[in-house]
Amino acid sequence: MRLSPVEKEKLFLFMAGELAKQRMDRGLKLNYPEAVAILSCYVLEGAREGKSVSELMKDGKHVLSTEDVMEGVPEMLEEIQVEATFPDGVKLVTIHEPIQ
């Protein structure tokens, strides 16, 4: 299987997101990279499902709470930006203050 660099990046991100979900399901608090992975996967999968940029920006704030992550992570993650492929092209999705 031959993957482009962008496809490889999305695959690694998906794998990191799945690992983070497993850890969260076991009751572990997520660190910074795990939180970024889960939020990024949410955006990529949401775009694939046909959600709009505005829906993802709004709903992305409710994916993780401060109780899901380690101390200090919400302050380190002021915003997240993900390039996602929508039916009408690639768009940048920005979620401000994604962990509340």
UniProtKB/Swiss-Prot annotation:
**KW Nucleus (keyword) present:** no
Catalysed reactions, as listed in the record:
urea + 2 H2O + H(+) = hydrogencarbonate + 2 NH4(+)
GO MF term set: nickel cation binding; urease activity
Record-stated family: Belongs to the urease gamma subunit family.
Q: Which GO terms describe its cellular component?
A: cytoplasm
What SUPFAM superfamilies does this protein's entry cite?
A: Urease, gamma-subunit (SSF54111)
Q: What is its main location?
A: cytoplasm
| EC numbers for this chain | 3.5.1.5
Q: Does the keyword Coiled coil apply?
A: no
Quote the gene name from the UniProt entry: ureA
Q: Note the InterPro entries from the entry.
A: Urease_gamma (IPR012010), Urease_gamma/gamma-beta_su (IPR002026), Urease_gamma_sf (IPR036463), Urease_subunit (IPR050069)
- Keywords in alphabetical order: Cytoplasm, Hydrolase
According to UniProt, this protein's pathway is: Nitrogen metabolism; urea degradation; CO(2) and NH(3) from urea (urease route): step 1/1
- Where does the protein end up? Cytoplasm
HAMAP family given for it? Answer: Urease_gamma (MF_00739)
A Gene Ontology biological process annotation? urea catabolic process
Record note on quaternary structure: Heterotrimer of UreA (gamma), UreB (beta) and UreC (alpha) subunits. Three heterotrimers associate to form the active enzyme.
Under what name is this protein listed?
Urease subunit gamma
Q: Which domain of life is it from?
A: Bacteria
